């Protein structure tokens, strides 16, 4: 298994809080999943897999496990069928909302010249 997807404690790069946060959230998909939960509240595995960014099922499963292991998301009424499991943000996951909002504003301001089709901030 790819070390990045391992749910064991990360290899902390340094004592810097930004680097430590990125050790947990700095992959390509984690903040996209958090974004979806902020926008929609609760999401099922199937709903995540239908995201326009096109996350593969093996990466999705690993990311959900990773974010759950660090207490950022939690299962809601899990059942035997993994595709029907629903997830929601915990208080520590919800605390990322202003971070994502600011990242969205920054992207809209500074990346629009490079990516003219970038969506307006909602």
Label every model-predicted segment.
Residues 2-3, 65, 87:
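A positively charged, amphipathic N-terminal helix/segment that binds anionic biomolecules
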Residues 11, 43-44, 83:
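A conserved beta-turn-beta hairpin within the catalytic core of GNAT-like acetyltransferases
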Residues 97-122:
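Amphipathic alpha-helical dimerization/coiled-coil segments
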Residues 48-82:
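Canonical helix-turn-helix DNA-binding module
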Residues 16-56:
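N-terminal helix-turn-helix DNA-binding core of bacterial DNA-binding proteins
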Residues 26, 79-103:
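Basic, amphipathic "hinge/linker" alpha-helix immediately C-terminal to the N-terminal HTH DNA-binding motif
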Residues 1-25:
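N-terminal leader segment of winged-helix/HTH proteins
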Residues 21, 36, 47, 63, ...:
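Residue-level recognition of specific faces of alpha-helices
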